[in-house]
Amino acid sequence: QPKNGEITAQQIKEALREDTILVSTMYANNETGYMLPVKEIADVVKHHPAAYHVDAVQVIGKLPVYPDELGIDFMSASAHKFHGPKGIGFLYFNHVKFDKFLHGGDQEDKRRAGTENLAAIAGMVAALKESLNCYQENMEYVESLKQQLLSELDGIHYYINND
């Protein structure tokens, strides 16, 4: 069982079955802040026929994420989490083949029928670029807030996820 909500690559390995076709994890838990060991999990899953999906909603625009370096097959994110338009997101996928899930048109390289919301897509791209351009400045600010909080907790026992 996960301790403090922390899932390890070994636990994923032990949970894989012969009929497992997809492993899907969060990159970071939105309530606890725990960041899963995505690269290590991907290293486990690559030795199995299953595909690996990562829900990166909580980290996109806050941390640099390179799906190819992580070794994941699918990654999803939502623009509103990095100050983009609501109602738009994206699905990254590498070489994995999958059947279309909405039939009727040839949009999205014949993977999904329907007209793309180009204005929302452009807004999402602009917001993501801006988030990544401000990454270092934002991380320094968040780190200063963390240090301020920790100084106030002096003498109090506490636990920090991922430390």
Residue map of PLM features:
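Pyridoxal 5′-phosphate
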Residues: 1-163
